[in-house]
């Protein structure tokens, strides 16, 4: 799983995930499923905010290429991925500037158009179940919740999905691709079932102990890259941007 994560996610995302885990005393090399989950969540948060701006009239607009003459402001403030101290500093600054209620838990994003914090969820289970868990934890109607699943389902507070359909479809496609790539490597079942993953980890560690004294041979050959899926609703410009933003997965 660790190899998969490092091959299939942008190095910046991998680095942020490693820092987040180490901040809580967790090891990405051991808790590989959590490593994959954090990288996935980070990527969804970044994709959520991609291309979305507010123009000089205060209207939301989608811009795929930078125009130096345009007076644009990022629609979303990304809070997820920052260390806790900096994240709370950003949250406090937003609250002081906008007057919105300070959340009890760190949210993932702030939407300057709707003036609300957003909690993003990515689940391997039923979206309804995960949504209720998030809502019960946050216990605030001020924070907007948006849940995505690896099966293409989604659920949001009051069925308000914030983004346009194409932007959400882009996120769903990426999640589906991650699922398919995990499945092709035999990683999906253990990712969905953490208990099975722990059992496999113990088995692997035991095997490493038994083989510790044996000579090893490492292959440095690089396998062909797998082409990124290009769904029919993506035009060539958007696809080019995505190709530049995300690394291609490699087959084993």
From Swiss-Prot:
UniProt KW Kinase keyword: no
GO molecular function, one term: RNA binding
Catalytic center residues: 80, 108
Feature type site, description Important for efficient shutoff activity and nuclear localization: 195, 198-199
GO biological process, one term: viral RNA genome replication
One Pfam family cited in the UniProt record for this chain: Flu_PA
Site, as annotated: Important for efficient shutoff activity: 202-203, 206
Record keyword Amino-acid biosynthesis present: no
Protein keywords: Decay of host mRNAs by virus, Eukaryotic host gene expression shutoff by virus, Host cytoplasm, Host gene expression shutoff by virus, Host mRNA suppression by virus, Host nucleus, Host-virus interaction
UniProt-annotated location(s): Host cytoplasm; Host nucleus
Family of this protein: Belongs to the influenza viruses PA-X family.
Role played: Plays a major role in the shutoff of the host protein expression by cleaving mRNAs probably via an endonuclease activity. This host shutoff allows the virus to escape from the host antiviral response. Hijacks host RNA splicing machinery to selectively target host RNAs containing introns for destruction. This may explain the preferential degradation of RNAs that have undergone co- or post-transcriptional processing.
Domain comment quoted from the record: The probable endonuclease active site in the N-terminus and the basic amino acid cluster in the C-terminus are important for the shutoff activity. The C-terminus acts as a nuclear localization signal. The C-terminus is recruited to host protein complexes involved in nuclear Pol II RNA processing.
Protein name, entry field: Protein PA-X
Gene source species: Influenza A virus (strain A/Silky Chicken/Hong Kong/SF189/2001 H5N1 genotype A)
Origin organism lineage: Viruses, Riboviria, Orthornavirae, Negarnaviricota, Polyploviricotina
